[in-house]
């Protein structure tokens, strides 16, 4: 119900109660959010940060493509920027290139296509990465030797009290699937510094990347992408494979036959089964190769987001 009740009554946010989270994630697993807010814009987000009770846990949701939600849902406030903070604008361009300004709730794939349409190169790697620019910043998303760090000019962030700050890639400490985001801060937008490119050439590069993806990844099934981080000098999928777990299944949660670091939902997987599968893979890999795998994905529990070192 809009702005009329809940922990943060305000006309600048839409506030919904008991919202199913599974449809808002790519894995399609999990229970309800106690509250879900959609701020009307940057001002609405700032007002929400200033007025919402600090004792309620808060989670910023992007495209939910790096996330496993607990079957019992989340007993706090999910902030969703995808409906209102999703503009993609060419801020400047000349013969050498340009600057693309993108709000955090914009889809990563759409961002890549807008850059291409404007003859701006450097975001082709994003064409097959699901989710939003906010999530891509938080995860320093990357593929095919490129990542957000390599193209980010700067990002605008909001702190827990609703004030705006600007940070560049170095200040954000972007590294492999990592960002030094201060606790409670939210990405609002990003500016990407892109070189001039030829739209058809960028399109063909995207096609090539997406073809490789289709060959290697189980895109027909719901998943959250790579479950584990690649340990130094190794690929998590090879370690899981070597431990004999390719295709292993608990209920409807399965280690993909196609890519052993993608765990797929065959239809009605529960978070319980997915977590059992994760722990099985972790233990078997430790026994088989002596490597301790850590999660790339986050697990949203009723109390908040659970992550592992490095993320
Ligand atoms: C089929 C498939 C393929 C994938 N391929 C790749 C790949 O090639 N490379 C890669 O890097 N990843 C890949 N991923 C993983 C995932 O798509 C990326 O990590 C993506 O960038 C996550 O974005 P999201 O918006 O979905 O984030 P979410 O899953 O919604 O959130 C991820 C984290 O970001 C935080 N977050 C989201 N928005 C904000 C914000 N505005 N401010 C602050 N924090 C925020 C969340 O709180 C959470 O901690 C893949 C996933 C799938 C399902």
UniProtKB/Swiss-Prot annotation:
Q: Which InterPro entries has this protein been placed in?
A: FAD-bd_PCMH (IPR016166), FAD-bd_PCMH-like_sf (IPR036318), FAD-bd_PCMH_sub1 (IPR016167), FAD-bd_PCMH_sub2 (IPR016169), MurB (IPR003170), MurB_C (IPR011601), MurB_C_sf (IPR036635), Oxid_FAD_bind_N (IPR006094)
Q: Where in the cell is it found?
A: Cytoplasm
Chief subcellular site?
cytoplasm
Q: Which GO terms describe its cellular component?
A: cytosol
Pathway(s) it belongs to: Cell wall biogenesis; peptidoglycan biosynthesis
Q: Which Pfam families match?
A: FAD_binding_4 (PF01565), MurB_C (PF02873)
Which cofactor is recorded for it? FAD
| Catalytic activity line of the entry | UDP-N-acetyl-alpha-D-muramate + NADP(+) = UDP-N-acetyl-3-O-(1-carboxyvinyl)-alpha-D-glucosamine + NADPH + H(+)
Active site residues per record:
177, 226, 296
Indicate the segments forming the FAD-binding PCMH-type domain, all copies.
28-197
The processes (GO biological process) annotated in the record are: cell division; cell wall organization; peptidoglycan biosynthetic process; regulation of cell shape
Q: What is its EC number?
A: 1.3.1.98
One example of the protein's molecular function in GO is: FAD binding
Taxonomically, which superkingdom? Answer: Bacteria
**Keyword terms:** Cell cycle, Cell division, Cell shape, Cell wall biogenesis/degradation, Cytoplasm, FAD, Flavoprotein, NADP, Oxidoreductase, Peptidoglycan synthesis
Function (record text): Cell wall formation.
* Entry's family note: Belongs to the MurB family.
Question: Would you tell me the protein name for this molecule?
Answer: UDP-N-acetylenolpyruvoylglucosamine reductase
Q: Which gene encodes it?
A: murB
């Amino acid at each position: 119900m809009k702005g009329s009740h809940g922990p943060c009554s305000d006309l600048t946010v839409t506030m919904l109660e008991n919202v199913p989270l599974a449809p808002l994630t790519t894995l399609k697993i999990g229970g309800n959010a106690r509250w879900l807010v959609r701020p009307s814009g940057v001002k609405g987000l700032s007002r929400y940060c200033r007025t919402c009770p600090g004792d309620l846990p808060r989670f910023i949701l992007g495209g939910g493509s790096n996330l496993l939600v607990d079957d019992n849902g989340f007993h706090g406030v999910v902030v969703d920027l995808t409906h209102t903070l999703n503009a993609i604008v060419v801020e400047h361009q000349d013969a050498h290139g340009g600057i693309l300004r993108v709000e955090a709730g914009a889809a990563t794939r759409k961002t890549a296509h807008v850059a291409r349409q404007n003859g701006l190169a450097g975001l082709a790697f994003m064409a097959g990465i699901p989710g939003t620019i906010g999530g891509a910043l938080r995860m320093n998303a990357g593929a095919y030797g490129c990542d957000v760090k390599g193209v980010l000019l700067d990002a605008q962030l909001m702190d827990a009290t609703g004030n705006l700050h600007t940070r560049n890639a170095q200040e954000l400490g972007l590294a492999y699937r990592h960002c030094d985001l201060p606790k409670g801060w939210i990405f609002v937008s990003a500016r990407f510094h892109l070189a001039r490119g030829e739209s058809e050439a960028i399109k063909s590069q995207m096609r090539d990347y997406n073809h490789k993806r289709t060959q290697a990844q189980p895109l027909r099934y719901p998943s959250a992408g790579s479950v584990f981080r690649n340990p130094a000098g190794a690929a998590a999928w090879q370690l899981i494979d070597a431990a004999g777990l390719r295709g292993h299944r608990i209920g409807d949660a399965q280690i993909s036959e196609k890519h052993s670091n993608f765990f797929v939902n065959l239809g009605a997987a529960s978070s319980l089964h997915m977590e059992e599968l994760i722990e099985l893979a972790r233990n078997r890999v430790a026994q088989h190769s002596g490597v301790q795998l850590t999660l790339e994905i986050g697990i949203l529990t009723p109390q908040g987001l659970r992550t592992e070192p490095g993320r």
